[in-house]
Swiss-Prot record:
Coiled coil recorded as keyword: no
Taxonomy, superkingdom: Eukaryota
Subunit structure: Component of the mitochondrial large ribosomal subunit (mt-LSU). Mature yeast 74S mitochondrial ribosomes consist of a small (37S) and a large (54S) subunit. The 37S small subunit contains a 15S ribosomal RNA (15S mt-rRNA) and at least 32 different proteins. The 54S large subunit contains a 21S rRNA (21S mt-rRNA) and at least 45 different proteins.
Keywords: Mitochondrion, Ribonucleoprotein, Ribosomal protein, Transit peptide
Transit peptide stretch: 1-17
Family of this protein: Belongs to the phosphatidylethanolamine-binding protein family. Mitochondrion-specific ribosomal protein mL38 subfamily.
Protein name per Swiss-Prot or TrEMBL: Large ribosomal subunit protein mL38
GO terms under cellular component: mitochondrial large ribosomal subunit; mitochondrion
């Protein structure tokens, strides 16, 4: 006897279930958006009341209310996901800060601790609060990953620098680049030399352009690494100024044996951002550095063996 299998309408049941779930999800989404908009309007009214009390006020409480009134709106989240960033809006700066703290800040701090940069530079306790992007190719915006070893063909050029503070205020900064591993064969110690120094740089989040490096107290000088030396740690620090302008006499500073803590103390500077890369000797170093205008003389140091 031939067995007959009953026909089960599985496809129609699945489609029916999917349509039920889709309708439920759509209703849940609309209800969520309605709640978000109601909360946003409530916070916005509180913000308007604060601004009516003092229209010129730009306190942290005002920025907090601006962020709360927009951060959960679907259109704001969509623009942030598509990288349509409005740098004049505090809510986008807040989300950028969250994104930066979740990865880039942790990576930077890990490299600084791993390579003992904080201890050897003398900056003491340090918690960066601005995003520092640095690169050597002006044709693209690809920043160097902190701790990367770069060849001399790259580092012989003046780098570009971009700083993003996560607030709408305009502040003035100084930027300094230090070589932490310059050997002194007479004292058998390592010294810190200054490779680059910029001062009185106005920076605000709304103006996303690379820093003007044409006016510098010390023009950029590439790191000088001789044959046989280990990799040099090149630290770039962004220092926030208390005033819009600091005046440094032309003969007050020298590149050699640079004391960072004393420099920050004299001119009242606060480290708020950093970047790190490394440089080593390679076959192109002699030819490139000998032609650089900031390097007066490049020659391999002759190290004699200490007599027994």
């Amino acid at each position: 006897m031939k067995r007959v299998w009953p026909r089960i309408p599985t496809i129609s049941n699945v489609c029916r279930a999917r349509s039920i779930y889709s309708a439920a999800q759509e209703n849940a989404y609309r209800s969520s958006v309605k709640l978000i908009q109601e909360y946003s309007e409530k916070v916005h009214k509180k913000l308007q009341a604060k601004l009516l009390e003092n229209p010129s006020e730009t306190s942290p409480e005002i920025e907090r209310l601006q962020v709360l009134s927009q951060i959960n709106l679907p259109e704001v989240r969509s623009k942030f996901h598509k990288k349509e960033i409005d740098y004049t809006n505090p809510v986008f700066l807040y989300m950028l800060k969250q994104q930066w703290e979740d990865y880039q800040k942790l990576l930077l701090l890990q490299r600084l601790e791993q390579m003992k940069v904080i201890k050897d530079s003398g900056i003491g306790s340090f918690s960066p609060s601005v995003d520092v992007q640095l690169g050597f190719n002006p044709e693209n915006n690809d920043s160097i990953t902190p701790g990367t070893i770069l060849p001399s063909t790259v580092t012989v050029k003046t780098p570009w620098l971009s700083v993003l503070p996560f607030n709408c205020k305009k502040n003035h900064y100084s930027v300094i680049t230090l070589d932490l591993d310059v050997p002194n064969y007479e004292t058998n110690r390592f010294e810190t030399h200054c490779n680059w120094l910029l001062t009185n740089i106005p920076i605000e989040a709304s103006k996303r352009v690379p820093i003007d490096t044409s006016k510098a107290f010390f023009q950029y000088r590439p790191p000088i690494v001789h044959r046989g030396e280990d990799k040099h740690r090149i630290l770039t620090l962004v220092l926030r100024q208390k005033s819009s302008s600091i005046s440094i006499p032309s003969n007050a500073l020298v590149r050699e044996r640079f004391d960072l803590s004393e420099f920050c103390s004299i001119y009242d500077l606060e480290p708020v951002g950093a970047h790190l890369w490394r440089s080593g000797w390679d076959s192109d170093a002699v030819a490139l550095l000998s032609k650089h205008p900031s390097v007066h003389e490049y020659r391999d140091i002759r190290v004699e063996r200490i007599p027994a």
